[in-house]
């Protein structure tokens, strides 16, 4: 089971239509259909009930949907955190300075940095 298959499944389940879901995912409808079919084959379950008017969740799809949403949300959060880490807006900053200098200036700079980047842990 791949996350891209789960994304496709969630999108079809929410759109209720393969065409609309394919458009939103920037896929062709046949490519989307293949992803869903591969997922169903792998699980050995029919997740969606297809009819002339569109698609609705099969009972097994109803069971899978909340789990698929959580997995996708977790992946999105992990990728967002990694982007923040790479951009320097999350992580840890260690600062060492000599107390003999202008301490109020150093303290104000550190306070300003903490305010600007609250997700960065600052050790002094």
Question: How should these model regions be labeled?
Answer:
Residues 42-43, 64-86:
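Alpha-helical linker/hinge and terminal dimerization helices associated
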Residues 40-59:
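A short LG(V/I)-centered, amphipathic sequence patch enriched
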Residues 90-124:
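Central regulatory/effector-binding core of bacterial HTH transcription factors
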Residues 12-27:
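Short helix-boundary/capping micro-motifs
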Residues 2-8, 29, 54, 61, ...:
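The N-cap/first-turn positions of alpha helices
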Residues 24-25, 36, 43, 64:
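Core residues of bacterial helix-turn-helix
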